[in-house]
Structure formats: C-alpha cells, structure tokens
Amino acid sequence: IHVRVPLVEGVNDDVENIRKTAQLCQELKNCQELEFLPYHRLGLHAYRQLGRNYQLEEHASMSRWDVYQKMGFLCETDWMFDIAISGLEVYKAGIGKTGVTEEVLKA
C-alpha cells in the first residue's frame, strides 16, 4: 500500500495530523510508503473555465521544502515504511533519513 496525502496549509498540515497519519500507516500491515504531496493551485484555471468554484483558492501553494519543514520530524522515528515528498524519498525504512538536502527540496 502506498498512502498519498496532499498537504494543504492551514487544513491538514499540523503536527498532530501528520503524526496520526504516520501512525495509521504503521498499523497497516502492507504499507510500503507514505508520500506527502504539496498542495498546488494548478487546477484553478480549469475550474474558472468551467465556471466552477475552486474551494481551496485562498490557500497558498506549498513547495517540497514547505512540506519537509512540516513533516521532517517524522524522519527521527523508526517507521516500517518509506516516506517521500512528491516522489522524493526523505526516509528509508530500516535505514532512516536519506541524504536529501535543503537545496534539492527547494529546487
């Protein structure tokens, strides 16, 4: 199982929610990866063209670095699954934090 969680600033990016999400993955027998997806506003234009209300319009886009700053504390705990941010692995099960740098996360 690969669990993918979009993080939206001010909606589900608090420490408690992130910790509970990881704990839920730990309880799943077949969870191989928890992947956090930074919220983006790329669909805004399409919603406007369709005349639809974009309910998250007031929320700012997040970068990988923004997400790492919110969830990086998870890399200090032993988990039975990998952790990634938009496909970039930041934690490897059984090994720990990967060598990903701030520069890479900000790119």
Residue ranges and their predicted role:
Residues 7-107:
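Auxiliary Fe-S-binding modules of radical SAM enzymes
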Residues 1-7:
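Short beta-strands and strand-loop turn motifs
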